[in-house]
Structures are given as structure tokens and as C-alpha cells.
């Protein structure tokens, strides 16, 4: 298991969360004047949240593997 990748994953999660928030704010900003643009930004926000969840789930799995190795499983 690559510890550098494991150590970097929380930063990746935070970056995805920040991107999701940025897109959501843009969606709210353009909701009234450009609803199609707002919809696109909200869709992009959802994609970033999905990316965040994928990374988070993988991180949890990798940490679980470390726990198993520690416990001799």
C-alpha cells in the first residue's frame, strides 16, 4: 500500500468538497437570471460530491485493511 497516496487522499477529499461548494454557490448565484446555467453548475456540484464519496470510501477501505493487518487478520 502506497502511504503517500493514502496520506494525500484527505486533501483530495477536501478539494472535491471545495469544488462542490463552489459549483453550488455558482448555481445559487445564477438561479434567477440563467436557470440552465444554474442547473449545469448544480449537476457539476453533484459530480464533485460523487468524486468525494468515491475517494472517501476507498480511503476507509484502505484504512480498514491497515487495521486488519495490525490485528493479524
Model regions and ranges:
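Non-heme di-metal
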Residues: 1-73
